[in-house]
UniProtKB/Swiss-Prot annotation:
Protein name as catalogued: Probable transcriptional regulatory protein BCAN_A1755
Upper taxonomic lineage: Bacteria, Pseudomonadati, Pseudomonadota, Alphaproteobacteria, Hyphomicrobiales
Family that this chain belongs to: Belongs to the TACO1 family.
Record bears the keyword Protease: no
InterPro entries for this protein: Integrase-like_N (IPR017856), TACO1_YebC-like_2nd/3rd_dom (IPR048300), TACO1_YebC_N (IPR049083), Transcrip_reg_TACO1-like (IPR002876), Transcrip_reg_TACO1-like_dom3 (IPR026564), YebC-like (IPR029072)
Organism whose genome encodes this protein: Brucella canis (strain ATCC 23365 / NCTC 10854 / RM-666)
S-S bonds: none
Amino acid sequence: MAGHSQFKNIMHRKGRQDAVRSKMFSKLAREITVAAKQGLPDPAMNPRLRLAIQNAKAQSMPKDNIERAIKKAAGNDGENYDEVRYEGRGPGGVSVIVEALTDNRNRTASNVRAAFTKSGGSLGETGSVSFMFDRVGEIVYKPEAGDADKVMEAAIEAGAEDVQSGEDGHVILCAFEDIGEVSKALEAALGEAESIKTIWKPQTNTELDEEKARSVLKLLSVLEDDDDVQNVYTNFEVSDEVMEKLSA
């Protein structure tokens, strides 16, 4: 396990689930609203909206919240969000990609830059680190979905490219453009997924010691807590020994 998956796991162990969940619903709602504004409010005719709704449902977001986010796109509340990607280097030289939906580019850029600077990292130009990542689809299932063989068979039939199974569940990867079809086929075989989204997958990882890892985790936590930030991706990894210390 590496990068953001480890970060999520550590935050889960530290008991931040409720706070993270509340903020997650807010960010999912923003993605739904933006998707609905950019296309038709009908998920059957809007692939991005369909994916956003699928992911929201997978995260147990209430139906009323989803419908409210869609209706908000049709309103004249003056909220228009720009999609912005930031790239930079964190402590230990790790690569970091930040995706944001913002109604104030200056505010978001200032906050993101400050987070990098305070952590000892630096914000770079767009494209400065993304070439070291691949854009792919990620579908996650809980362990209860089935054993490794069952999930592997379903993933192959669905057209997925890779499957990683472990005690925490199953992570299925597919081509970026195939995520809609693959997730639909997997749902028919395995039921509803725990999450469905597109991610930046690092081509190689940078292993960190405990000190540098703590600094990176602090940076990721600050970025995740920013209301404008939707997703954060990085290529760090730590040993099992360091992981246990960070989770304590």
